Amino acid sequence: MRVYYYTAEEFALSNIINERIKISLIDDLNDPFEFLGVDLSNKSFRQAFKAGRCRSKECGIISFSKDWNNPLMWAHYGDKHKGMCLGFDIHDSHIKEVTYFPERMAPEVDMEKKYGGLTEDIVVNLMCTKYIGWKYENEVRVIVPLEEKDPSGFYFTDFKGNMELQE
């Protein structure tokens, strides 16, 4: 699937030169309700959710859009229309669709009984759930393991393998 990464020109050029892209940590994403797409009133779910939140610290997110020509995306992520938009081909099996909801999801099952706790699939679903107000982003995500920090203090992943820069 062809997906697009909006960024400032200086970061785009650095990405191209170094053949890598920055991985965002959950706590650094711009939506203050990120990873809070669920109603935590159920105690067993809340406990499982906390465990999943800890597991989420082992991986990061790279956010892409399916659209390269969205004026709001250029304004918000493309350095106020002065940046660049990089187009990548990424195999569909590595892409996670973001689902948008008008309110927090309420779990209707006992997580422990039905799933044996918070499964990897449930954690991924939580990581790919956003409030409906963000729907204009038409976002997809790639979830990657966090390895060693760059000397700058950030995490990066190479373009090689599952991600090919095309435009």
What are these regions (language model features)?
Residues 1-167:
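Partner-binding and oligomerization surfaces adjacent to conserved cores of proteins
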